[in-house]
Amino acid sequence: MSRYLARYMVSRYFSSASSRPLHVCIVGSGPAGFYTADKVLKAHEGAHVDIIDRLPTPFGLVRSGVAPDHPETKIAINQFSRVAQHERCSFIGNVKLGSDLSLSELRDLYHVVVLAYGAESDKDLGIPGESLSGIYSAREFVWWYNGHPDYSSLKPDLKTSDSAVILGQGNVALDVARILLRPTTELASTDIATHALSALKESSIRKVYLIGRRGPVQAALTAKELREVLGIKNLHIRIKQTDLSVTPADEEEMKTSRARKRIYELLSKAAAAAKTSEADPDQRELHFVFFRQPDQFLESDERKGHVSGVNLQKTILESVGTGKQIAVGTGEFEDLNCSMVLKAIGYKSVPVNGLPFDHKKGVVPNVKGRVVSHTSGDISQTEPGLYVCGWLKRGPVGIIATNLYCAEETVGSISEDIEEGVWKSSKAGSKGLMQLLEKRKVKKVEFSGWEKIDAKEKQMGIERNKPREKLVTWEDLLAAAAN
């Protein structure tokens, strides 16, 4: 039997017209979850897909992670909304895996469970002083200015001094630097949370330091994001000329990567332009600080328990293997004073009970999206009916579109397993889930509830001349959904 015919026969077996629909549950309503749902619905005409999320709002980091001054990136929401409105798809928000229901209960209810809940925690540096107040992860800061209900009450210290330090030089670091330095008049017409805009208007921050362990050639950012921050009005760029010196190893890296060469050229051009112009005392400054790594955080003498700076160790690059250079500490140290530190060193996924998890890599062990319970030699034992997609599958890397290919691979594995006849028993699916949630008095938010939230936010936005005014507390979100 051909592969096409086998897939057709399986699709007919799990037909919506029969008593054996294929019940699929996707945990997480970000890009990975919606792309997976879309591909499952297209591949299997008998599939019924439920997308659950702990938040009452769908779309994951497209809503809470994308910077407010990047509205074009949020266009993906239109496609995801069409998926959620599909007759064989349901969004069920305000349902938390691990507390409202367990993974084992989901697996009992559905033929297929796909975990796509991303990375909602942060990597730690593991250095002294990391618990001082005034130190935040970039994720916390991003969720604060994007109106995430978990962080709407955050009070980042923007007024104690004129300096903030960002550890990391990737695109997330550039995002938070841009929000700190961009004129608030330009942010006012975006969907930035009002509490964040008000705080930024009163901010004393005038100098932002972007700290990287390696050099400008190795900076983990993209030219598009860099050009945007370099183009901020009345922003003075500062880069030490010595940091722009390149070695033969750097030259080799740029030969093999046009992107790295372009980044270096943009930084060099910005540094040269800054040398020929005098800094206005009222200008804001963005300092790119290379070849430094944090050794410890310094505590304020005046404000006990609060950060007052970062002790940095100078680094040099050493070649390891072909074309790769790593940062090595030199034993020389210097202090950099600040009142706020943002750690943009990476997101981290968290496990749930009953889920195999690689704590070192921060991912669920998997083979092409199939969750692996244990491995012996070259043989991997997989968990029947349990799959993973997105950051939980591959780590917190890539852009929104990366999840499209990731979902394609996972759904390919699901289809192969269906063809092999892995599931032949009936499952309760949506009906069983709704009964369980009702029994536990969980206030679920369906897509119609989200549409009420969406309509209210847009209406409030019209009144304030912005795309939307986000509801930023759990109470307000749930009240709007139930209205």
UniProtKB/Swiss-Prot annotation:
It comes from the Eukaryota. Keywords: Biotin biosynthesis, Electron transport, FAD, Flavoprotein, Mitochondrion, NADP, Oxidoreductase, Transit peptide, Transport. SUPFAM superfamilies: Nucleotide-binding domain. GO terms for biological process: biotin biosynthetic process; electron transport chain. FAD binds at A32, D53, L61, L97, W391, G398, I399, I400. NADP(+) binds at Q169, G170, N171, V172, R213, R214, E225, G398. Transmembrane segments: none annotated. InterPro entries: FAD/NAD-bd_sf (IPR036188), FAD/NAD-binding_dom (IPR023753), Ferredox_Rdtase (IPR055275), Ferredox_Rdtase_adrenod (IPR021163). One of its GO terms (cellular component) is mitochondrion. GO terms for molecular function: flavin adenine dinucleotide binding; oxidoreductase activity, acting on iron-sulfur proteins as donors, NAD or NADP as acceptor. It is found in: Mitochondrion. Residues 1-14 form a transit peptide. Its main location: mitochondrion. Its EC number is 1.18.1.6. Associates in vitro with the adrenodoxin-like protein MFDX1 to form an efficient low potential electron transfer chain that is able to reduce cytochrome C. Functions as accessory mitochondrial protein involved with BIO2 in the plant biotin synthase reaction. Belongs to the ferredoxin--NADP reductase type 1 family. This is NADPH:adrenodoxin oxidoreductase, mitochondrial. The gene is MFDR.
